[in-house]
């Protein structure tokens, strides 16, 4: 294995996602939170950059913008951001949350990266975390990581999916179970040599060419 590090975001943070909008990249990431030792208090922040290449002279982040937050007694952790720029209408959506509460969806302004004024979060799933949204042929797919992580060979992470005709849900698996009620079809599980696959990501290499990523 070869480690290829990227640019460091100001203020640290974890679990980033990025989407290209026009000639800029919008990055969403988490500050604190995560349940258990991390507590439930957290924030999801967004910032812009002209490039993701830390060696470029144009590499410079804008000031972070808070788009979601949670407090210690809340039923959702503001962590694990996932971005979707809807190809059907250009609207921008952010999912976030962990296994310790609801997965929530909010709408952002694609011009500013700020939360749309007056937008109220929507609960779309439970019993998963590190969600990502994909649009395909009239369907919105919600992928989430189910199970426990960070326990070596005892980790039970796996990736589940549901789909909906609307980005706001309801997301349903192949058996008709709603992800808001704990449903989700397993699509990636542990193998003989790998334990705990999670944090699904999709990367567009070129027109018609995409690759997926996940961690063990």
Segments and roles (model prediction):
Residues 12-17, 79-82, 129-132, 198-201:
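Beta-propeller and closely related beta-sheet repeat lectin domains
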Residues 1-21:
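Blade-loop segments of beta-propeller domains
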């Amino acid at each position: 294995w070869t480690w290829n590090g990227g640019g460091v975001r100001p203020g640290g943070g974890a679990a980033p996602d990025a989407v290209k909008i026009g000639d800029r990249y919008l990055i969403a990431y988490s500050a604190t939170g995560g349940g258990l030792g991390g507590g439930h208090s957290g924030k999801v922040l967004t910032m812009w950059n002209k490039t993701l290449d830390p060696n470029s002279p144009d590499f410079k982040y804008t000031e972070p913008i808070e788009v979601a937050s949670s407090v210690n007694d809340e039923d959702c952790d503001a962590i694990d951001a996932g971005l979707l720029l809807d190809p059907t209408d250009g609207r921008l959506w952010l999912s976030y949350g962990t296994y310790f509460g609801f997965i929530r969806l909010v709408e952002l302004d694609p011009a500013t990266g700020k939360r749309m004024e007056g937008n109220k979060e929507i609960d779309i799933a439970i019993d998963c975390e590190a969600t990502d949204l994909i649009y395909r042929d009239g369907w919105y797919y919600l992928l989430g990581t189910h199970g426990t992580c960070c326990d070596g060979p005892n980790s039970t992470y796996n990736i589940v999916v549901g789909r909906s005709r609307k980005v706001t849900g309801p997301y349903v698996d192949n058996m008709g179970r709603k992800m808001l009620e704990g449903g989700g079809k397993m699509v990636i599980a542990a193998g003989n040599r790998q334990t705990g696959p999670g944090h699904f990501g999709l990367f567009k290499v070129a027109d018609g060419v995409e690759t997926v990523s996940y961690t063990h």
